[in-house]
Amino acid sequence: ERMGVRRYHLLHPSRVYQALEGYWGSQTMGFTPAMQHLRFTPVPTPPVPVGLSLPEQFVAVRWYQRATWPLREELVDWTRAMVAAIAERMPVVVLQSSVYLDDHVDFPVPEGPNIHHVIAEPWRENLAVQSAILKRASAFVGTWGGVAQLAVRLGIPPAACYDRWHSCSYAHQ
C-alpha cells in the first residue's frame, strides 16, 4: 500500500531453488535446460552520488574477508600486490564499507597515486553507492562473493578470487 501497489505476485526464493534443484542440487540437469527456467533482466542502478568524482575509466576492486578468502598475511600481501599491479596500468577505485554488519571485513589495500578509496556512505546506502560505482567500472577484481556476482549482473567483467572453496553453496560456483 505504501508504495501504491495494489496487486502483486510474491516469488519466494524457494521456488527458484526448487525449479533449478536438478542443476545445482543433484546435478542431473544440464546448463541448457536450466537456462530455460531463467530470464535475466537488467539490474537498475542509482546514479553516482553528487560530489563523488570518479576517473573516466577504472577498475573497481573489493577485497574482503570471508570463508573463501581468509584474512591471512600471505593473502593480504598478494591482494596488495594485485591492486598495485592494476594501478600501474589503470586507475583503481577501491569499494569500501563504513560499517561491518557481518564477517565481511575489508582487506587492507594500499594507498597510491592511481588508487582511489571510496567509502560508501551513508552506511544504509552502502550497496546502492557501490552498485552505482561498479556500473561505471571497466572491470571488477576482488573476492569471490556477492559483489563479484553483482558485477556479472551489471554486465561488468569480473575477475574474482578465492583461496579455498568451502562454506559455499554449489549454486554459487
Named regions from a protein language model:
Residues 61-66, 79-127:
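Catalytic donor nucleotide-activated moiety binding site of glycosyltransferases and closely related
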Residues 130:
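Acidic, amphipathic alpha-helical patches
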Residues 135-141:
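Acidic donor-binding loop of glycosyltransferase active sites
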Residues 148-173:
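Nucleotide-sugar donor-binding patch of glycosyltransferase catalytic domains
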Residues 93, 141, 157-161:
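Hydrophobic/aromatic beta-strand patches that form the interior of the parallel beta-sheet core
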Residues 2-64:
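A nucleotide-sugar donor-handling region in carbohydrate enzymes
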Residues 99-100, 146-148:
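Alpha-helix capping/helix-boundary segments
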Residues 66-76:
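A short, glycine/small-residue-rich beta-strand->loop->alpha-helix junction that serves as a flexible
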